């Protein structure tokens, strides 16, 4: 008879009193097997004394079915014996349908048909809503739920609903803590098989999905799909609230939390909440002290991979972010974004207390501490507190004596980078800070600020003792010594003290015999 798929037509009994379960079992077992595989030749003769071939229409199938007059069945070879044979055969499921293209075997012809579409690229199931095509009907059914918003699968534990059964199954593992998939290489466990598969590629180094545009390779096909959107500029995920679009669905999900204020990720250690899981993961390292990302060049370790990537640019000198306006390059994207505001004049961050605006959010945060008086950065050495971390870093160098910034021109060292930058202008002669009033130029911004007070006659520094005001802070400091009696500048020859360095310098000339400087205009001393 060959391997034609036949089924005993138990639904066409003539007066047979046979259970529904038996008919289901016969249909299930026989559907993918030849009759000879199931029943011995003698049993076939005993069973099929009266047989007719008919097309079975009630199930909507095109298979030919044997219809038996059950009145002739030998009582000694009844349902039980054949049920046992059929159950045994159904459980073994010989894979008799083979793919000619790749040699893979399947138990069902329908599965083979679906499989063949991988090789042919055929996608016969089309979404009427958006035109997207699929190689499986089930995938189209799942896809349609995106348009309808249908989420038929609900979690009994927390009430969360899902489009797909597989999503619910995976979600349940959050509640149970089940991680059934273990890596043989490092014993790490995972909730999902796909996570384990992706993880294994870390050990093998396999990246089977290359980008045809730039050659970059990926461990997962989904990562390649997302990456391609960099080249195409495609942003298929749009926020209904503000219309902002994203190239990743996860980015849209995270963005939505700005509108909802949702922060679903909570730190068990301190109770701090976050709107992204990755932010919680990074935060936890504060408690654990873990720094898993280490620089091979200098050994410095970081809590975040992004921080390591940025740090590496110090060694390589790489500055991949360029300003289109002036051509200046930066090693961080955030630095470029801040820099661009110099050209646009944009200051999007406003202080609600005084109305002052800033180009950077970090500058606003620091500024707010002027109003609150908050000084969160404390020196362990002397207890002095600061409102900026950079100020604490600079202060620490007083105790350590470290001066990490060296001038390549003259070898002079400085505690602060800004001091080195100002110093370099002595060698270059650069004076970038110009007075609009008189045109005089200066190499430091602070010197220009002091100079401007000559024109404005502003004297912002007032003595609390006598009320006298000064245009420079250093002048007020010197003046205060009159009230305190402090004379910090002493003559080494006679021990006489002075409260000003300039007076001390003039006095020293008595012993040195040095002529005092004459005035260039009138010639007087």
From Swiss-Prot:
Keywords: DNA-binding, Metal-binding, Nucleus, Repeat, Transcription, Transcription regulation, Zinc, Zinc-finger. GO terms for molecular function: DNA-binding transcription factor activity, RNA polymerase II-specific; RNA polymerase II cis-regulatory region sequence-specific DNA binding; zinc ion binding. The keyword Magnesium does not apply. GO terms for cellular component: nucleus. InterPro entries: Znf_C2H2_sf, Znf_C2H2_type. Its main location: nucleus. A zinc finger (C2H2-type) spans 97-119, 125-147, 153-175, 181-203, 209-231, 237-259, 265-287, 293-315, 321-343, 349-371, 377-399, 405-427, 433-455, 461-483, 489-511. It is found in: Nucleus. GO terms for biological process: regulation of DNA-templated transcription. May be involved in transcriptional regulation. Belongs to the krueppel C2H2-type zinc-finger protein family. This is Zinc finger protein 678.
């Amino acid at each position: 008879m060959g391997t034609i798929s036949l089924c005993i037509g138990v639904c066409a009994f003539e007066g047979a009193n046979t259970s529904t379960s038996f008919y289901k079992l016969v249909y299930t077992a026989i559907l993918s097997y030849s009759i000879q595989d199931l029943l011995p030749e003698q049993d076939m003769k005993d069973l099929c004394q009266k047989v007719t071939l008919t097309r079975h229409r009630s199930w909507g199938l095109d298979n030919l079915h044997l219809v038996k007059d059950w009145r002739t069945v030998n009582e000694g070879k009844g349902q039980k014996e054949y049920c046992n044979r059929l159950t045994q055969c159904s459980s073994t499921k010989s894979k008799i349908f083979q793919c000619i293209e790749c040699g893979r075997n399947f138990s069902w012809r329908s599965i083979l048909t679906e499989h063949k579409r991988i090789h042919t690229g055929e996608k016969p199931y089309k979404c009427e809503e958006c035109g997207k095509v699929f190689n499986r009907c089930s995938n189209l059914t799942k896809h349609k739920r995106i348009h309808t918003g249908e989420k038929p699968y609900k979690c009994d534990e927390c009430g969360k609903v899902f489009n797909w059964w597989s999503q619910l199954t995976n979600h349940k593992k959050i509640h149970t803590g089940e991680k059934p998939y273990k890596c043989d290489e490092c014993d790490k466990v995972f909730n999902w098989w796909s996570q384990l598969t992706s993880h294994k590629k870390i050990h093998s180094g396999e990246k089977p999905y290359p980008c045809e545009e730039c050659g970059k390779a990926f461990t997962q096909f989904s990562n390649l799909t997302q990456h391609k959107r960099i080249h195409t500029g495609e942003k298929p995920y749009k926020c209904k609230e503000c219309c902002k679009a994203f190239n990743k669905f996860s980015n849209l999900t995270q963005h939505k939390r700005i509108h909802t204020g949702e922060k679903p990720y909570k730190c068990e250690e301190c109770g701090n909440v976050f709107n992204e899981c990755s932010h919680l993961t990074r935060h936890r390292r504060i408690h654990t002290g873990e720094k898993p990302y280490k620089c091979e060049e200098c050994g410095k370790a970081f809590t975040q991979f992004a921080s390591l990537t940025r740090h590496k640019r110090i060694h390589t000198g790489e500055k991949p972010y360029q300003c289109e306006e002036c051509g200046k390059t930066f090693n961080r994207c955030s630095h470029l974004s801040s820099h661009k505001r110099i050209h646009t004049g944009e200051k999007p961050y406003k202080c609600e207390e005084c109305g002052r605006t800033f180009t950077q959010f970090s500058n606003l945060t620091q500024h707010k501490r002027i109003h609150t008086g908050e000084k969160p950065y404390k020196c362990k050495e002397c207890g002095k507190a600061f409102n900026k971390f950079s100020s604490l870093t600079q202060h620490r160098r007083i105790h350590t004596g470290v001066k990490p910034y060296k001038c390549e021109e003259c070898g002079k060292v400085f505690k602060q980078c800004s001091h080195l930058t100002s110093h370099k202008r002595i060698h270059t002669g650069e004076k970038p800070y110009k007075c609009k009033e008189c045109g005089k130029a200066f190499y430091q911004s602070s010197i220009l600020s002091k100079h401007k007070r000559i024109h404005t006659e502003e004297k912002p520094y007032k003595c609390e003792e006598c009320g006298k005001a000064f245009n420079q802070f250093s002048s007020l400091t010197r003046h205060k010594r009159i009230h305190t009696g402090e004379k910090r500048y002493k003559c080494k020859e006679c021990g006489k003290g002075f409260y000003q360095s300039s007076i001390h310098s003039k006095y020293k000339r008595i012993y040195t015999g040095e002529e005092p400087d004459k005035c260039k205009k009138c010639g007087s001393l």
